[in-house]
């Protein structure tokens, strides 16, 4: 694998796909509460700056082919490696490489974590655990504001806005799906097959080319079938919306 990498080198397309993917990955990771908390906590813990993501993305976005080759030649080429083989019981002959390294533990001294100084403090309850808690008030769910619109071609649209992260999610549903073929035995599986085919080649792109174009901008366009519809799903960064919609049009039409 490393020999083929050296022979092939790093292409502009490789760099474009990496940049698009890594930026999308970090930004999309901030959409959920868990994603925000985990990233803020990790950066605060290891760098002292909870907003380290800004600097991190800046470093990734400016990476070059020369940077990749420099790191490869400095840290990987000709360096020691570790092989880990997970084998079925009784088939040890499948091991990737012989076990030729032994850890020298003669000079090892276990660190003192201070466990022997800890004292167990038993929790004290302020309620009776033998009694089932009573019902509290029903929670009030605050539904985000949304809007509806009917386009000139009678297509109905529903949307909502959120300014937390610069992303756009689009779902286009066409009536159909498994329910419409339920009473037509000669068409069973047609909805699923149609959705699978729509994820393959288009008029101007092979499936591989379409995937590569989406990776360059960190977007996704997929087609799936459900009980009552065929659904086109789009996920993209706001700045790449126009390019992504062009690829959606290519896939749909």
Locate the predicted segments by residue.
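His/Glu-rich zincin catalytic helix
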Residues: 84-213, 217-220, 225, 231-236, ...
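Acidic/histidine-enriched alpha-helical segments
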Residues: 2-29, 34-40, 80-92, 211-216
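Extended non-catalytic domains of envelope/secretory-pathway proteins
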Residues: 1-4, 36-37, 49-51, 63-66, ...
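Hydrophobic, well-ordered secondary-structure elements that form the walls
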Residues: 22, 68, 154
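Generic recognition of flexible, low-complexity loop/linker segments
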Residues: 55-58, 69-74, 145-147, 157-159
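Scaffold signal of the M16-like zinc-metallopeptidase fold and its non-catalytic homologs
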Residues: 27-60, 92, 244
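Extended, domain-scale alpha-helical bundle/helix-rich regions
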Residues: 68, 74-83
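M16/insulysin-pitrilysin zinc metalloprotease superfamily fold
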Residues: 1-29, 187, 200-206, 234-253
């Amino acid at each position: 694998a490393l020999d083929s990498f050296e022979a092939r080198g790093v292409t502009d397309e490789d760099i474009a796909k990496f940049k698009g993917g890594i930026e999308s990955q970090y930004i999309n990771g901030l959409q959920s509460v868990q994603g925000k908390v985990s990233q803020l906590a990790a950066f605060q813990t290891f760098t002292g700056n909870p907003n380290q993501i800004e600097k991190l993305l800046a470093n990734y976005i400016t990476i070059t082919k020369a940077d990749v080759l420099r790191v490869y030649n400095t840290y990987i080429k000709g360096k020691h490696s570790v092989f880990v083989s997970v084998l079925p019981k009784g088939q040890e002959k499948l091991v990737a490489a012989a076990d030729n390294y032994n850890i020298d533990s003669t000079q090892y001294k276990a660190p003192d974590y201070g466990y022997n100084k800890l004292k167990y403090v038993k929790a004290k309850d302020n309620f009776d655990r033998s009694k089932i808690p009573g019902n509290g008030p029903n929670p009030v769910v605050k539904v985000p504001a949304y809007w509806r619109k009917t386009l000139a071609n009678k297509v109905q649209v529903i949307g909502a806005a959120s300014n937390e992260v610069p992303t756009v999610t689009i779902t286009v549903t066409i009536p159909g799906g498994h329910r419409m073929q339920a009473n037509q035995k000669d068409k069973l599986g047609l909805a699923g097959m149609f959705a699978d085919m729509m994820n393959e080649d288009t008029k101007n792109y092979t499936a591989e080319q379409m995937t590569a174009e989406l990776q360059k901008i960190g977007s996704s366009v997929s087609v799936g079938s459900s009980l009552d519809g065929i659904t086109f799903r789009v996920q993209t960064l706001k700045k790449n919306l126009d390019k992504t919609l062009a690829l959606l049009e290519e896939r749909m039409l």
